């Protein structure tokens, strides 16, 4: 979803900085190519968001390369399926919390000094926040937290003219599912129970991120926008 959103922003005229794990360099440079084909500047910043020092450096590097910061999208997430809470290790739980809760917190803190009135912060929540799956105990917690940080931060930053909103995807095909985020049984039926009868593609919700950042969405803040193919919404 981050890839689709980055490309959508570039095609609407934004210069874009993205973060990626060093092991994902080939994918990152594919995104850079598409951003440049759109006639915009692309900046790829490798590193681990679970480290506070890196989150700070990432923001500073993005500001330096882009000449400022107007939009912050917190999209990175960790999702691992675990059938029983008894089998969930403290290490796995901690990794999910660091990626899904700590990293956005650190990134927002680092970005705030650079965000001027009219800026926007957008978070990726999930339908798991309000309709959690039993095997996603830790992930679902983090997405409920994401919904609430959107609503709380929107109230806090309103007086500064900074809007905060979230996007809550339903069954969207992303690397999360095939890298341990869902069982094979779940993958075989993924998205089939939605009213549309299929999973969505990241490109089908990328425009929501763009609209939430747009100047003509200036009265929209503290909201969570669902994209679930017709199933439960926040």
Model-found features: residue ranges?
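Canonical Rossmann dinucleotide-binding motif of NAD(H)/NADP(H)-dependent dehydrogenases/reductases
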Residues: 1-17
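Short C-terminal tail/terminal secondary-structure segment
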Residues: 82, 131, 192-196, 209-210, ...
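Substrate-binding pocket helix/loop in short-chain dehydrogenase/reductase
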Residues: 83-85, 89-94, 190
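Active-site helix of classical SDR
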Residues: 108, 142, 150
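Residue(s) in the substrate-gating loop at a strand-loop-helix junction
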Residues: 126
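A glycine/serine/threonine-rich, flexible loop-to-helix segment
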Residues: 155, 159, 169-194, 204
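Short, small/polar-rich loop/turn modules that mediate ligand/substrate recognition or access, typified
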Residues: 158, 163, 220-222
């Amino acid at each position: 979803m981050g890839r689709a959103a980055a490309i959508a922003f570039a095609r609407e005229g934004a210069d874009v900085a993205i973060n990626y794990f060093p092991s994902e360099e080939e994918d990152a440079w594919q995104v850079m190519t598409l951003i440049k084909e759109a006639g915009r500047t692309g900046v790829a910043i490798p590193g681990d968001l679970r480290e506070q020092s890196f989150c700070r450096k990432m923001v500073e590097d993005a500001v330096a390369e882009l000449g400022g910061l107007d939009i912050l999208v917190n999209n990175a997430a960790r999702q691992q399926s675990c059938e029983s809470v008894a089998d969930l290790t403290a290490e796995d739980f901690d990794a999910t919390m660091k990626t899904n809760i700590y990293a956005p917190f650190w990134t927002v803190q680092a970005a705030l000094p650079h965000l001027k009135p009219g800026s926007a912060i957008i978070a990726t929540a999930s339908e798991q926040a309000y309709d959690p799956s039993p095997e996603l105990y830790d992930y679902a917690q983090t997405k409920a937290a994401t919904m609430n940080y959107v609503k709380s931060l929107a109230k806090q930053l309103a007086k500064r003219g900074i809007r905060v909103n979230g996007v809550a995807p339903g069954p969207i095909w992303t690397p999360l599912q095939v890298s341990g985020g869902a069982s094979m049984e779940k993958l075989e039926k993924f998205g089939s129970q939605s009213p549309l009868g299929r999973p969505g593609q990241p490109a089908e919700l990328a425009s929501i991120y763009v609209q939430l950042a747009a100047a003509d969405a200036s009265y929209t803040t503290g909201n969570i926008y669902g994209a679930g193919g017709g199933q439960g919404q926040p």
